[in-house]
UniProtKB/Swiss-Prot annotation:
Taxonomic superkingdom: Eukaryota
S-S bonds: none
Gene: Slc49a4
Function comment: Mediates H(+)-dependent pyridoxine transport.
Designated name of the protein: Solute carrier family 49 member 4
Organism: Rattus norvegicus (Rat)
Length: 478
C-alpha cells in the first residue's frame, strides 16, 4: 500500500474518550455488535498520515460532481439565449441529478464488495465521460442540447458514490475521535461544489440583455455561448486531473484498521437491507433526513427561477445560493468537530439545527409573499433568510450520517447512507418533476420548505438515539 507515505511520527493511537458510557438502551445492542468482531486478527488502532490525502482526493471528486451538477441553474437566463433552452430544459438538467440515483443500489453493492478504490475510479471515469460529452463542438443546437443532457446524466450517475461513501471512508481510514470530522469534510465538499457553481457561472457568463438591437443581440448570444463553453471546458479539465490523481494513488484501505469498529465484520448485503427495512427507528430518522434535504436540494437547484418573480437578478441569486451553502459547509464541519469532542449529542444538535431551519424557511416564504404579509422584501432579508436556511440544513448532513451509522451498526456504512440518500433524491426528483410542468409559478415550492422542516423536527423529537458503534470502540476496546 506504499509504506513510504507514513512514518512513525505520522502514526499514532486514536484517542478513545475517557469514561464514555453507552446511551440508554445501548448496552445490549453494543454487546451484540461486539459479537461481530473477528476471533483473531491484527490489533486495530493505527491511523496513517496518508488518510488526509485519501480524504482530499475524495473531497475534490465530490466537489467537482456538485459543481458540474449545478452548472445550469445559476446561468439559466444566459443558457436560454445561447442554446434556446426552455424552463423545462433547465428543470430537467437539474433533475438528472436525482435520476442518477436510480442505480444507487448497484453502486452500494460495488462499494460493499469491491471497496473504495474501484468505486471511486468508476465514478470519476463517468464524470470524465459526462463532462467531455458536453464539450463536443457541434453547430446543431438540437444535437448540442442532447449532448449536454447526456453529460448531465453521466455526472448524475456519479452522485451515489460521492454522497454515500463519506461515512465508509471515515470509518475505514480515521479513528473514532476523527470520524465525524472526516465525514463532514467528505460529504460537505459536494455541496460546496454546487455553491461554487452559483459563483462561477454568473461571474464568467454574462446575463443576456433583452433590450439590445437585433445585430447586437446576435453578437451577445455568440459571446454568451463562448463563455458558457469556457466554463464547460474548465470543468472537463478539472475532472480529468482528479481522475488522473485517483488513478495514480487511491488505496482501498490502510494496512491496519484505525479502530475496533473498522476491524469488525459487517452484515451481508441482503441481511443489511432486511435489518434496515425492519428497523422502525432507522426509518423514522431516515425520513427526517430525506424529506427536508430532498426538498432543499431541489429548491436550491432552481433558486434562480424562484427568485426571478421577486425581481432578484441572476448575479444576486447566485450570491445568495453561494453563501447559503458555504455557510452550511463551514458550520457543518464545525458541528462535526464538536460532535467528535462531545460524543453522544447528535440528536440534540439536530434538534437545534432544525428548529432554526423551520424558523428561517418560514421567514423566507412569508417574505416572498410581502403583498399579503407586508413583510419588508429587501436584498438583506432575502440574503439573511436564505443563508440561515442553508446553514441550518446543510450543516445537518454529516450529523445525520453519523447518527444513521450508529443506529444500525453493524450494517455497512455505504449501504446505510445509500438508502437514505436514495430516499432524499426520490423526494427531490418528485418535486423537480412537478417543476418541469408547473415552472411558471413556484410559490408552492417555497411552502414545501417550512412544512418539511417542521415534519423533520417532530420526527427527530420522537427518535430514540443509540450509539452502538461508539460503544464498541470506546467500551469494548477498553
Amino acid at each position: 500500500m506504499g509504506s513510504g507515505w507514513s512514518s512513525e511520527e505520522e502514526e499514532r493511537q486514536p484517542l478513545l474518550g475517557p469514561g464514555l458510557g453507552p446511551a440508554p438502551g445501548a448496552t445490549r445492542r453494543g454487546r451484540e455488535a461486539a459479537a461481530v468482531l473477528p476471533a483473531a486478527g491484527p490489533s486495530p488502532g493505527r491511523v496513517y498520515g496518508r488518510r488526509w490525502l485519501v480524504l482530499l482526493l475524495f473531497s475534490l471528486l465530490a466537489f467537482a460532481q456538485g459543481l458540474v451538477w449545478n452548472t445550469w441553474g445559476p446561468i439559466q437566463n444566459s443558457a436560454r439565449q445561447a442554446y434556446s433552452f426552455t424552463g423545462w430544459d433547465i428543470a430537467l438538467l437539474v433533475l438528472w441529478g436525482p435520476i442518477g440515483f436510480l442505480p444507487c443500489f448497484a453502486f452500494m453493492w460495488l462499494l460493499d464488495k469491491r471497496g473504495l478504490r474501484i468505486t471511486v475510479l468508476l465514478t470519476s471515469f463517468l464524470m470524465v465521460l459526462g463532462t467531455g460529452l458536453r464539450c463536443i463542438p457541434v453547430s446543431d443546437l438540437t444535437l448540442k442540447k442532447r449532448l449536454i443532457h447526456g453529460g448531465q446524466i453521466l455526472n448524475g450517475l456519479a452522485g451515489p458514490t460521492v454522497m454515500n461513501a463519506a461515512p465508509f471512508l471515515s470509518t475505514t481510514w480515521f479513528s473514532a475521535d476523527e470520524r465525524a470530522t472526516a465525514t463532514a469534510i467528505a460529504s460537505m465538499l459536494s455541496y460546496l461544489g454546487g455553491a461554487c457553481a452559483f459563483l462561477v457561472g454568473p461571474l464568467v457568463v454574462p446575463a443576456p440583455n433583452g433590450t439590445a438591437p437585433l445585430l447586437t443581440a446576435e453578437s451577445s448570444r455568440d459571446h454568451i455561448k463562448d463563455r458558457i463553453e469556457t466554463v464547460l471546458y474548465a470543468e472537463f479539465g478539472v475532472v480529468c486531473l482528479i481522475f488522473s490523481a485517483t488513478l495514480a494513488y487511491f488505496p482501498p484501505r490502510p494496512p491496519l484498521p484505525p479502530s475496533v469498529a473498522a476491524a469488525s465484520q459487517r452484515l451481508s448485503y441482503r441481511r443489511s437491507f432486511c435489518r434496515l427495512l425492519s428497523n422502525l427507528r432507522f426509518l423514522m430518522i431516515a425520513l427526517a433526513y430525506a424529506i427536508p434535504l430532498g426538498v432543499f436540494a431541489g429548491w436550491s437547484g432552481v433558486l434562480d427561477l424562484i427568485l426571478t418573480p421577486v425581481h432578484v437578478s441572476q448575479v444576486d441569486a447566485g450570491w445568495i445560493g453561494f453563501w447559503s451553502i458555504v455557510g452550511g459547509c463551514v458550520v457543518g464541519i464545525a458541528m462535526a468537530r464538536f460532535a467528535d469532542f462531545i460524543r453522544g449529542m447528535l440528536k440534540l444538535i439536530l434538534l437545534l439545527l432544525f428548529s432554526g431551519a423551520t424558523l428561517s424557511s418560514t421567514w423566507f416564504t412569508l417574505t416572498c409573499l410581502n403583498s399579503v404579509t407586508h413583510l419588508p422584501l429587501t436584498t438583506v432579508t432575502l440574503y439573511a433568510s436564505c443563508i440561515l436556511l442553508g446553514v441550518f440544513l446543510n450543516s445537518s448532513v454529516p450529523i445525520f450520517f453519523e447518527l444513521f451509522v450508529e443506529t444500525v451498526y453493524p450494517v455497512p456504512e455505504g449501504i446505510t447512507c445509500g438508502v437514505v440518500t436514495f430516499l432524499s433524491n426520490m423526494f427531490m426528483g418528485v418535486l423537480l418533476f412537478f417543476v418541469t410542468f408547473y415552472h411558471t409559478e413556484l410559490s408552492w415550492f417555497n411552502w414545501c420548505l417550512p412544512g418539511s422542516c417542521l415534519l423533520s423536527l417532530l420526527l427527530i423529537l420522537c427518535f430514540r438515539e443509540s450509539y452502538d458503534r461508539l460503544y464498541l470502540d470506546v467500551v469494548v476496546s477498553v
